[in-house]
Amino acid sequence: MNRYKNCIPEGTKEIEINTTLPMEINLDLLGGISFEKGCFIGQEVNARIKYKGLVKRKYVPIHFKNKNFSFSNLNKVDNKIFLESQNIGEVIALSLNKEDDVWYGIAKIKLSQLYLFEENNKLECDFCSSKIKINFPSYMLPLPRKI
């Protein structure tokens, strides 16, 4: 549960092989990439992405409360997330915390839309019939802003 609350994905079900960039899953913010050390596989690509700002999506931690939701719903319907009726991302993983009946998970959000998100905004989804909230861990703050 803490892994989802802190937005730390693992495994091939949460991280798409050959398509997910290290910066999308916040490895740069967690100290998983060195931009001082050279000569490692992918070093030039990672540096170019970081310094040119080419990341288009970011993983963020989400949560929502819905007693009627079951995880099997996610496989049967669209897992898209909306902000003001605009598709801005998708749910990657979910897990129920039985202590407080809250679903915690990770979503992939378009970075171009993330700057529009404010604390009082709630994201919408079709599969859970609930408002999704994002609680950014301290390592993700301040939020990226539109350039």
Regions found by a protein language model. Give the residues of each.
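Glycine-rich, small/acidic residue-mixed loop/short-helix segments
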Residues: 30-31, 48-147
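Anionic-ligand-binding alpha/beta catalytic cores of soluble enzymes and soluble regulatory domains
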Residues: 2-64
